[in-house]
């Protein structure tokens, strides 16, 4: 099916059929083209492909039929023109940003971000003369005030990792483009997936994913994606990846992600249903000081969540009374949940940001980003919700005895 035909289909049909390729053997599953290079018919053909005058494969760092399948699938689901894969989520982030900025440029970013993204923006880019201003993106006016004549990127996570702050994508995109139509609004959509939120439809220019998480969904792949206009994705592919990061997704990993994405919608429905039940339990437990989950009416940005998200996801941030030591006690007391970083797996994962994912932050940076010492991040899995709740209850009860 061509792209126009696919666009008429529902989400579930797209996630199964988008990107599918026919092969001469009639294999139903996507073939794994485990090759580093591709043969040319002639020197002239090789020249045309390197000059981008002819479509076709050259070298797997630049593209591979198996990775093309999953790239086209995600582009279709995000309503983007094109997609570029990378060997990790941070590989997608760096390949994307390096293809845009030069020394002397400026970026506005949310003050609360995934730890490695923050480290790259705050510590890495400064070594190369790129200035980054971090703001609380819950209020679009903060973004507006931070914009400069040399601002090339507005970088957002919504919900933000780990404290679940939301950003009004449509409002920020309008502000950024009014300031400079060439300014790229980049949204990390890892927490939501295209099933729950589509930033391009809301005015953003670029969408990023760590496909390690929900897109793959089974905890056995490291991968990332960049989605946007074809012209920009070509720039990421032939500048950001080819010449700068070399962050290339292997064909076997691409195959696994494509397989995982065929069940994305039903997995996300279950994740979200479980998370709602778990959040409602946590909100009432006496050991919990505060909880951030967009599906709770007590969540400060509940109305924004309803406006730009289909469902509220499966990530929960909650702070336990007693600070750092209480957080450690809770983590060390769970028996059913798995203590691990990452998210979006079938298993429920629990972790302590201050000592794990956000260790690249200094204590002062964590405080400035509203990451409390007792904050716990929970990735609600696909198990029975009652079993997840029972485990959390026995662990939390130890904090109030």
From Swiss-Prot:
InterPro entries linked: Cys/Met-Metab_PyrdxlP-dep_enz, Cys_met_metab_PP, L-Met_gamma_lys, PyrdxlP-dep_Trfase, PyrdxlP-dep_Trfase_major, PyrdxlP-dep_Trfase_small
Binding positions (substrate): 114, 377
Any single GO CC term annotated in Swiss-Prot or TrEMBL for this entry: cytoplasm
Keyword Glycoprotein recorded: no
Alphabetized UniProt keyword annotations: Lyase, Pyridoxal phosphate
Annotated residues for binding of pyridoxal 5'-phosphate: 59-61, 89-90, 210-212
Signal peptide start-end: none
Primary enzyme class: lyase
GO molecular function: homocysteine desulfhydrase activity; methionine gamma-lyase activity; pyridoxal phosphate binding
Modified residues (N6-(pyridoxal phosphate)lysine): 213
UniProt-listed Pfam families: Cys_Met_Meta_PP (PF01053)
GO BP annotations listed: transsulfuration
Cofactor field: pyridoxal 5'-phosphate
Protein's UniProt keywords contain Lyase: yes
Reactions performed catalytically: L-methionine + H2O = methanethiol + 2-oxobutanoate + NH4(+); L-homocysteine + H2O = 2-oxobutanoate + hydrogen sulfide + NH4(+) + H(+)
PROSITE patterns: CYS_MET_METAB_PP
EC numbers for this chain: 4.4.1.11, 4.4.1.2
Function: Catalyzes the alpha,gamma-elimination of L-methionine to produce methanethiol, 2-oxobutanoate and ammonia; methanethiol (methyl mercaptan) is considered to be one of the main causes of the oral malodor associated with periodontitis and may also play a role in the pathogenicity of T.denticola. Also displays homocysteine desulfhydrase activity, degrading homocysteine to produce hydrogen sulfide, 2-oxobutanoate and ammonia.
Subunit structure and binding partners: Homotetramer; dimer of active dimers.
Family: Belongs to the trans-sulfuration enzymes family. L-methionine gamma-lyase subfamily.
NCBIfam families per record: met_gam_lyase, PRK06234.1
PANTHER family with a match to the protein in the record: CYSTATHIONINE GAMMA-LYASE (PTHR11808:SF80), TRANS-SULFURATION ENZYME FAMILY MEMBER (PTHR11808)
Protein name as it appears in the record: L-methionine gamma-lyase
Source organism: Treponema denticola (strain ATCC 35405 / DSM 14222 / CIP 103919 / JCM 8153 / KCTC 15104)
């Amino acid at each position: 099916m061509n792209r126009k035909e696919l666009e008429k289909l529902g989400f579930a049909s797209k996630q199964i059929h988008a990107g599918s390729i026919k092969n001469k053997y009639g294999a139903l599953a996507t073939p794994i083209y485990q090759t580093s290079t591709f043969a040319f018919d002639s020197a002239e053909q090789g020249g045309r492909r390197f000059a981008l005058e002819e479509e076709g494969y050259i070298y797997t760092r630049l593209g591979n039929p198996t990775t093309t399948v999953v790239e086209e699938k995600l582009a279709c689901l995000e309503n983007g023109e094109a997609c570029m894969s990378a060997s990790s989520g941070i590989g997608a982030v760096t390949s994307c940003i390096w293809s845009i900025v030069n020394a002397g440029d400026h970026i506005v970013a949310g003050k609360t971000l995934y730890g490695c993204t923050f480290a790259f923006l705050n510590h890495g880019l400064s070594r190369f003369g790129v200035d980054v201003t971090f703001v609380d993106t819950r209020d679009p006016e903060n973004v507006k005030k931070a914009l400069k004549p040399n601002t090339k990127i507005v970088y957002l996570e919504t919900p933000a990792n780990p404290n679940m702050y939301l950003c009004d994508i449509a409002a920020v995109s309008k502000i950024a483009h009014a300031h400079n139509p060439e300014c790229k609004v980049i949204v990390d959509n890892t927490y939501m997936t295209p099933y729950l939120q589509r930033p391009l439809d809301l005015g953003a220019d670029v969408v990023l994913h760590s496909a390690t998480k929900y897109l793959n969904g089974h905890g056995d792949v490291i991968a990332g994606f960049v989605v946007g206009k074809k012209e920009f994705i070509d720039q990421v592919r032939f500048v950001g990846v080819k010449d700068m990061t070399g962050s290339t997704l292997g064909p076997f990993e691409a195959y696994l992600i494509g397989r995982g994405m065929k069940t994305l919608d039903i997995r996300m429905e279950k994740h979200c249903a479980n998370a709602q039940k778990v959040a409602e339990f946590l909100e009432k437990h006496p050991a919990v000081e505060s909880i951030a989950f967009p599906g709770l009416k007590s969540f400060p940005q509940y109305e924004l969540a309803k406006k730009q998200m289909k469902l509220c996801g499966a990530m929960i941030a909650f702070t336990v009374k007693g600070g750092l030591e209480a957080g450690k006690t809770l983590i060390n007391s769970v028996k059913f949940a798995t203590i691990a970083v990452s998210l979006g797996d079938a298993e429920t994962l629990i972790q302590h940001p201050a000592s794990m994912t956000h260790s690249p932050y200094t204590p002062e940076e964590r405080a400035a980003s509203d990451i409390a010492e007792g904050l716990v991040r929970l990735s609600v899995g696909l198990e029975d919700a009652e079993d997840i709740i029972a485990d959390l209850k026995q662990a939390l009860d130890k904090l109030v005895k």
